[in-house]
Curated annotation (Swiss-Prot):
Topology relative to the membrane: Lipid-anchor
Organism: Escherichia phage lambda
Lipidation, S-diacylglycerol cysteine type: C17
Source species taxonomy: Viruses, Duplodnaviria, Heunggongvirae, Uroviricota, Caudoviricetes
Function text: Not known; is expressed during lysogeny in Escherichia coli.
Covalently attached lipid (N-palmitoyl cysteine), positions: C17
Highest rank taxon of the organism: Viruses
Protein name in the entry: Lipoprotein bor
Gene: bor
Length: 97
C-alpha cells in the first residue's frame, strides 16, 4: 500500500508542469525576466487567446531575446482543484542586457 501511494504521489509531482521557450535572438539575456504576467484562463483556455507585446515591454523588437510560457506546479494544482475550470498560465519576457 505504501509503495502504491508513493508511486501515485511521485507521478502527480512530475506530470503537472509544462514550459515552452521561444528564443528570438542569440544575445545574452538578463538572468531575471523583465516582466512576468499571469494569464487567467477558464475551461483549459478553450477558445481564449491572450497576447503579450514583448517589443513594448523591452523597448523595441530588437531588444527581445526570448519569451517563455509556463504552467507551474501551483497553476496545475489550481487547475486540478477546480477540475479544469480555472487554469492559469505564466508568461515571461527576457530582454537583452
Amino acid at each position: 500500500m505504501k509503495k502504491m501511494l508513493l508511486a501515485t504521489a511521485l507521478a502527480l509531482l512530475i506530470t503537472g508542469c509544462a514550459q515552452q521557450t521561444f528564443t528570438v535572438q542569440n544575445k545574452p539575456a538578463a538572468v531575471a525576466p523583465k516582466e512576468t504576467i499571469t494569464h487567467h484562463f477558464f475551461v483549459s483556455g478553450i477558445g481564449q487567446k491572450k497576447t503579450v507585446d514583448a517589443a513594448k515591454i523591452c523597448g523595441g523588437a530588437e531588444n527581445v531575446v526570448k519569451t517563455e510560457t509556463q504552467q507551474t506546479f501551483v497553476n496545475g494544482l489550481l487547475g486540478f482543484i477546480t477540475l479544469g475550470i480555472y487554469t492559469p498560465l505564466e508568461a515571461r519576457v527576457y530582454c537583452s542586457q
